């Protein structure tokens, strides 16, 4: 019998893990997602806009993207149709965007095809599979079958550290919960890391809502309008982000350590010291979380930290190394918290 591998609560809470990468800020993280909507509602236009934006590193749906290679498996289309759609949006070819109209199915070679593509294009960030049914080997839509197929794609996304989005259809019947309208069993929504459901307010109105839910994203309802000239879904309200408080803490810490180089003390003492550079209120019981969860960002700014146990509690030890600061502001003499917030 294989021994169960465990980690203690303290080990997990004090380890700096590689942060989850968002390919579309606040909307799509690494992992497996479902994008569902009624036939001909405009899912393909949304996917194509996402592909082009990620490949070029441009904003989409009002959110920043992580630039990288995008692969779009248009399994219900032809290259002629893809060409026509591309020319509707742009007349300039985009690097780092690739298409295919044929692929193997799940469990019969699809995973290997995507893995091979990742080896050949190491900058791969996202794969769109349009549609789910085109890569399934059978028509069984039971919970077990749905979960089994999707779990293969989830394992692939986790292994390659990429985002995989599977385009799917919604049921015709209405439901007060839009995620219940995703065709198939609850095995689909149960397996994926997130679900996006595009629902038109009225058929043909070109006004819609994109409902979003996921493990690494906040629940959101984004109001959209389809611009027939641009062939894009345009956000008609703002998608708020929740990272502002974290950004203020990191900015304050950076400004403080640029002045003092080092700090050793308790969380309460650190909160007190940060009042030197900002009037923002921080809380000692959140300091450890903020340091651990933003460990990779701190290293980018040349900040190392560790904890030391004493009889009176745990000490936080911080040190700033200018030589290891890879930010573009390290040579700036006067850095303030307000100026730095948007950069962190």
Model-derived features: where do they sit?
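Conserved inter-motif catalytic segment of the P-loop NTP-binding fold
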Residues: 2-4, 10-12, 17-19, 23-24, ...
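Phosphate-binding/switch region of NTP-binding enzymes
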Residues: 22, 34-36, 40, 45, ...
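Pre-Walker A (Motif I) flank of P-loop NTPase domains
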Residues: 29-33, 68
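Hydrophobic positions on the alpha1 helix immediately C-terminal to the Walker A/P-loop
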Residues: 46, 50
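Amphipathic alpha-helical transducer elements in NTP-driven molecular machines
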Residues: 79, 83, 107-111, 143-151, ...
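Short, conserved catalytic or adaptor-binding loops enriched in Gly and charged residues
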Residues: 88-96, 185-189, 298
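DNA transaction DNA-binding modules
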Residues: 224-344
């Amino acid at each position: 019998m294989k021994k169960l591998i465990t980690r203690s609560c303290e080990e997990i809470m004090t380890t700096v893990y590689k942060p989850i990468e968002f390919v579309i800020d606040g909307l799509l993280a690494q992992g497996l997602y479902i994008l569902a909507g009624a036939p001909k509602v405009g899912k393909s236009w949304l996917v194509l806009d996402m592909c082009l934006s990620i490949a070029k590193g441009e904003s989409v749906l009002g959110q920043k993207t992580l630039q990288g290679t995008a692969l779009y498996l248009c399994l219900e289309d032809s290259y002629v149709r893809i060409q026509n759609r591309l020319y509707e949006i742009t007349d300039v070819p985009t690097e780092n965007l690739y298409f295919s109209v044929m692929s193997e199915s799940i469990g019969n070679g699809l995973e290997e095809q995507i893995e091979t593509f990742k080896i050949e294009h190491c900058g791969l960030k996202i794969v769109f599979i349009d549609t789910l049914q085109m890569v399934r080997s059978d028509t069984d839509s039971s919970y077990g079958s749905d979960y089994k197929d999707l779990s293969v794609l989830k394992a692939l996304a986790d292994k390659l550290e990429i985002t995989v989005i599977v385009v799917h259809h919604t049921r015709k019947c209405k439901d007060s919960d839009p995620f219940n309208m995703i065709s198939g069993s609850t095995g689909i929504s149960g397996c994926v890391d997130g679900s996006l459901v595009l629902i038109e307010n009225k058929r043909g109105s070109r006004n819609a809502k994109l409902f979003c839910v996921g493990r690494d994203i906040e629940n959101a309802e984004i109001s959209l309008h389809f611009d027939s000239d641009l062939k894009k879904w345009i956000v008609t309200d703002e998608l708020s982000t929740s990272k502002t408080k974290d950004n203020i803490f990191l900015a304050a810490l950076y400004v403080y350590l640029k002045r003092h180089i080092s700090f050793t003390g308790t969380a309460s003492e650190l909160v007190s010291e940060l009042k030197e550079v900002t009037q923002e209120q921080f809380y000692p019981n959140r300091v450890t979380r903020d340091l651990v969860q933003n460990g990779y960002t701190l290293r980018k700014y040349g900040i190392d930290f560790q904890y030391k146990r004493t009889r009176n509690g745990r000490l936080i030890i911080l040190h700033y190394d200018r030589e290891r600061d890879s930010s573009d502001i390290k040579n700036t003499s006067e850095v303030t918290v307000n100026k730095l917030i948007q950069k962190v």
